[in-house]
Amino acid sequence: MKTLLLSLVVVTIVCLDLGYTRTCLISPSSTPQTCPNGQDICFRKAQCDNFCHSRGPVIEQGCVATCPQFRSNYRSLLCCRTDNCNH
């Protein structure tokens, strides 16, 4: 009986873990959002445009399947794999 109960507990834990999804910040002032399936990387990039010197960089945050490539107009780029790590 104990073996059956232990087996059920293990199966339940494994099944719950398979359904886990990442949560990331979508904007600097937002609450965390659940990422779509397959997008388990949080990112945050600060990008400069023509108005960067007067108002600062444009911040973009969210969920991605792969980390974006760093570009010359990025001030910074962060990719991470833990919940809400892109603050």
From Swiss-Prot:
Gene3D superfamilies for the chain: CD59
Protein origin, superkingdom: Eukaryota
GO molecular function list: acetylcholine receptor inhibitor activity; ion channel regulator activity; toxin activity
Disulfide bonds: C24-C42, C35-C63, C48-C52, C67-C79, C80-C85
Key words of the record: Acetylcholine receptor inhibiting toxin, Disulfide bond, Ion channel impairing toxin, Neurotoxin, Postsynaptic neurotoxin, Secreted, Signal, Toxin
One CC-aspect GO term: extracellular region
Signal peptide residue numbers: 1-21
PROSITE patterns, per the entry: SNAKE_TOXIN
Main subcellular localisation: secreted
CDD domains, per database record: TFP_snake_toxin
Compartment(s): Secreted
Claim: Transcription regulation is one of the keywords in the record: no
Tissue expression from the record: Expressed by the venom gland.
Subunit structure: Homodimer and heterodimer with kappa 2-bungarotoxin; non-covalently-linked.
Purpose: Postsynaptic neurotoxin that binds and inhibits neuronal nicotinic acetylcholine receptors (nAChR) with high affinity (IC(50)<100 nM). Is a selective, and slowly reversible antagonist of alpha-3/CHRNA3-containing and some alpha-4/CHRNA4-containing AChRs.
Family: Belongs to the three-finger toxin family. Long-chain subfamily. Kappa-neurotoxin sub-subfamily.
Name used for this protein in its record: Kappa-3-bungarotoxin
